[in-house]
Amino acid sequence: MNAQKGFTLIELMIVIAIIGILAAIALPAYQDYIARAQVSEAFTLADGLKTSISTNRQNGRCFADGKDTAADGVDIITGKYGKATILEENPNTADGLICGIYYEFNTTGVSDKLIGKTIALKADEKAGKLVLETVNSKTTNVENKYLPSAFKKP
């Protein structure tokens, strides 16, 4: 009598079930990883605009050349997943002129978890850094788990 070679149907079904379970666990984790990577672009662009704000403040405004509105290419940077814009809050507030950066994600070409989401950052000039805060009525509505650890909301 010849010995059978190969796998039985039950063994193959068990392997397929295990692969399915692993895929069900890995897919959401991968989607979160993609969203976090896309959010990092916002902070990269904001870091470049932070330097512009510091230079622009020497002219007494948040925008380049002391203008009243953001100029494309100077105060507005378009990335692969969205657009970062310098904001200026009313200089007549008790705190004086407040500068910030507003990042808005594109409606296409980004993770489903980021469509229509925004990030608002205030330039803390004394500390020389950006902080997650409402600026000129613009807020952050990206889920906390996608933000870098230094910017997580309490």
Curated annotation (Swiss-Prot):
Entry's transmembrane regions: 7-29
Identification of the protein by name: Fimbrial protein
Bilayer topology annotation: Single-pass membrane protein
Propeptide: 1-6
Gene it is expressed from: tfpA
Keyword Amino-acid biosynthesis: no
Gene3D superfamilies referenced in this protein's UniProt entry, alphabetically: Glycoprotein, Type 4 Pilin
GO CC terms, sorted: membrane; type IV pilus
Protein origin, superkingdom: Bacteria
Subcellular location: Fimbrium; Membrane
NCBIfam families xrefs: IV_pilin_GFxxxE
Subunit architecture: The pili are polar flexible filaments of about 5.4 nanometers diameter and 2.5 micrometers average length; they consist of only a single polypeptide chain arranged in a helical configuration of five subunits per turn in the assembled pilus.
